[in-house]
C-alpha cells in the first residue's frame, strides 16, 4: 500500500528527513516515534502530497504521490495534527462538503451516518463545529479522513491534547477500520 524509498526533505541547508525508506502493507498499522522536530509530520505531509520531497519516492498503491497526486490522493484519508475544520459549518454540513470534495461514490446518507456512528459524533452532527469540545473536533477530523473508505489512513498525532477516555474513544474507530479492512481481504 505504501512504499517509501530514500525520501528526504531539506529546508535550505537543514535536513528535516534524511533518506527514510519503509513499506506498509494492507491492513498494517505503523507509527512514527521520535522527539519534536524529528521529521514525523514532515514525512506524513510528503506521503499525502501536502509537501514535496527534496529527493526519493513515495508510492501509494503503486502511484507516485508527486507524479500523479490526484490519483494517489484518492486512496488516502488524512488527519493532520491540526484537523482541517470549517468551524462555521455544522458537523453534517462539513462532512457533506468533504464527501463532495472527494467525489465520493458511496451512498451519501448511509455512508456518512456509518462514519458518524463509528466515531461517535451522531449526537452532535447538527451542531456547529466551533461549539464542540476538542475531543469532538478531533473526532470530526477523523470522520473527514474516513469519508470515501480510503485504503490508506494517515493520522498525525490524532490523540494529542485529549484525555485518557477520549484517547480510547479515538483509537476504537481506528482499530475497527483496520480490522474491517483486514476482514475484507480474507
PLM region descriptions:
Residues 35-39:
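Walker A (P-loop) phosphate-binding loop of ABC-type ATPase nucleotide-binding domains
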Residues 178-186:
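Single conserved hydrophobic/aromatic residue that forms the stacking wall/gate
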Residues 153-157, 162:
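Catalytic Walker B motif of ABC-type/P-loop ATPase nucleotide-binding domains
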Residues 149:
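Conserved catalytic motifs of ABC-family nucleotide-binding domains
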Residues 56-67, 71-72:
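Conserved ABC transporter NBD signature motif
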Residues 96, 100-124:
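Conserved ABC ATPase "signature" region
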Amino acid at each position: 500500500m505504501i512504499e517509501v524509498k530514500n525520501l528526504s526533505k531539506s529546508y535550505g541547508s537543514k535536513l528535516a528527513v534524511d533518506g527514510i525508506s519503509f513499506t506498509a502493507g494492507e491492513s498494517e498499522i505503523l507509527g512514527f516515534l521520535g522527539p519534536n522536530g524529528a521529521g514525523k509530520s514532515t514525512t506524513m505531509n510528503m506521503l499525502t502530497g501536502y509537501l514535496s520531497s527534496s529527493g526519493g519516492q513515495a508510492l501509494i498503491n503503486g502511484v507516485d504521490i508527486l507524479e500523479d497526486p490526484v490519483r494517489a490522493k484518492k486512496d488516502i484519508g488524512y488527519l493532520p495534527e491540526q484537523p482541517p475544520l470549517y468551524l462555521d459549518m455544522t458537523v453534517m454540513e462539513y462532512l457533506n462538503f468533504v464527501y463532495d470534495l472527494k467525489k465520493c461514490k458511496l451512498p451519501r446518507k448511509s455512508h456518512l451516518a456509518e462514519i458518524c456512528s463509528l466515531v461517535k459524533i451522531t449526537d452532535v452532527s447538527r451542531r456547529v463545529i466551533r461549539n464542540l469540545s476538542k475531543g469532538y473536533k478531533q473526532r470530526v477530523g477523523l470522520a473527514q479522513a474516513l469519508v470515501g473508505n480510503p485504503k490508506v489512513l494517515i493520522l498525525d498525532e490524532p490523540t494529542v491534547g485529549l484525555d485518557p477516555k477520549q484517547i480510547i474513544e479515538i483509537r476504537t474507530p481506528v482499530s475497527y477500520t483496520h480490522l474491517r479492512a483486514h476482514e475484507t481481504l480474507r
